[in-house]
Each structure stands twice: as structure tokens, then as C-alpha cells.
Amino acid sequence: MNFLRAPRRFGRLAALSAVSLSAACVSAQSLPEAPAKACQSVEHRQFDFWVGHWEVFGPAGKKVGENRIELIADGCALLEQWTGHGGVTGKSLNIYDAVDRRWHQTWVDNGGTLLMLVGRLVDRSMVMSLTGPSPSDPKVAVQQRITWTPAADGSVRQLWELSSDAGTTWTVLFDGRYVRAR
């Protein structure tokens, strides 16, 4: 029976009630149960020490920029938003992959730099690395390693290094101390 063209004996109110009841039954039957929250494992929380609004200082104590790291996607990823005093801006997306059991970071900046790092927590430090072409000579393969280490005072040290001899020696590209912004 077409309820919208129901005989007058049912009346329009009865027809609309029947349509509403039918829609509610279909809707109630098709609603999936709320899924368990993803990304709640201990491993997913390993990089949370980096979350916050930071002022970043170089080794000599001079402020070199600001960084905001926030949890996104219901806590499944970290979004980094860097603003350097030299005009460099960049963002990274960081996520723990439960399949390969490693952390992944994809960094892009306004200079066209793309870094795709992979790593894990080593002791208390997050260590990510990549092997790829040298920024100064694309014909030469280099290793890059970035280590984030939380300190007892709540600050975080970020050390970015490069090796062109398969990890025998390392050159520091960036050494920053993150202090929570006030």
C-alpha cells in the first residue's frame, strides 16, 4: 500500500505515522554499533611527549622558531606545524602503524623539502630515519636521522643528523631545545 496515497479512511496523519515508523525501524536496524576507539595502545601514545605549543631554541640559546604539535584524527596521528624565524614553514604528519609496528613521519615545507622517515621508540627517545638522495647532491645517497628526547624539566631535544658514510660519522643539521610556550 502506498501510504502517501492512502485512502481517506486512514487519514494523512495515519499515513505519515506509518511512514515515520517504517523509517525508524529501518534506521534502527541499519545503525552499526559504535566501534571501539582505535589508536589507544601504549605504542600509539609513545610520541605524546611532543604534543604541545613550543618555543624552539638553538644550541646557543637563541630562539629559532615555534612549533605546534597536536593530536588529530581522534588521537591516531600527530600534526606538526613549524614556523621558523628564517621564514621556513613546514608541517609533518606522524602516525604509529600497528601493522609494521613503526612510527612514520611525512614532512613537507615551503622550500619544497619532503622527508619520509620511519622509526620507533628507543629507550625514551623517538628515533626516525631515512636513506635517500643528499639534499646538496641527488646522486649521493645519505642517511638522515632525527631523534626527539624528552627531558626531566618537560623540554624536548630534537637532534637532526646526516651521514654520508653509511652511519660511521654524523653531521648535525639541527639541534633544537623545545620549551613549552607560555
What are these regions (language model features)?
Residues N2-S17:
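Bacterial N-terminal signal peptides that target proteins for export
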Residues A18-V26:
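Hydrophobic core
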Residues C25-R182:
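Hydrophobic small-molecule pocket/channel-lining residues, especially in calycin-type beta-barrels
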